[in-house]
Amino acid sequence: MLDFPAHYSSTPSTQCLPPMRHPSLVSLSHDHHHGLALALRCRKQALGQLKPMGAAGLRERAKEFADFYRLNLIAHFRAEEEILFPLMRAAVPGSAALLDELLGQHEQLRQAVPQLDAGSGLAKLIFDLGDLLERHIRKEEREIFPLFEAHIDAPQAEMIGVELKKILGEGGGVSVNDKGLD
C-alpha cells in the first residue's frame, strides 16, 4: 500500500470531489479530465445539442477529437502501454484481462481516428468515439488506478511517476482548448 504525503487526504469533505490520486498518476488523471469533457461534447454534438449544429458542428468536433488524439492520446497510450500496464500486469494478480480490455480499447480508438475524415456516418462515429473514450477513462480511473494505489509500493510508484513524466512531459497532456484548437 502506498504512503501518501501528509498533505494528501482522501477524507471526504463537504463537497463531492473526485478521488485524490497518487502524485505519480496525476498527469494521467489530468488527461482523463480533458478526455471526459471531450467525450461529453462529442456525444452532445452527435445528438444535435451543441452549436454549431449539423455538418459544420460535426466537422468541428471531429477536428477537436483528432487534435486531442494527436496532442494527448498518442503519448498517453504510450505511457500506459510501455510503463504503467506492464508494471500492473507483473504486480497485480488477476489484472491481465482488465489490461487486455483497455489495450483493445486503445486500438479501437487508434483505428477510429482516421475515419473522422470521412464525411458519411460522422454523427454516429463521433457519438461512438465519445462513448468509448468515456467508458475507457472511467475504467482506468475506477479500476486500474485504485489497483495501482493498493498494490504498488512507494519506491515503484515514484519510479513510475518519473518514467511517465518523461513521456507525458511535466504538466501531462494539454487540453485541445488550452492550445486554442477548439
Where is each model-derived feature located?
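Small-residue-biased structural context
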Residues: 2-182
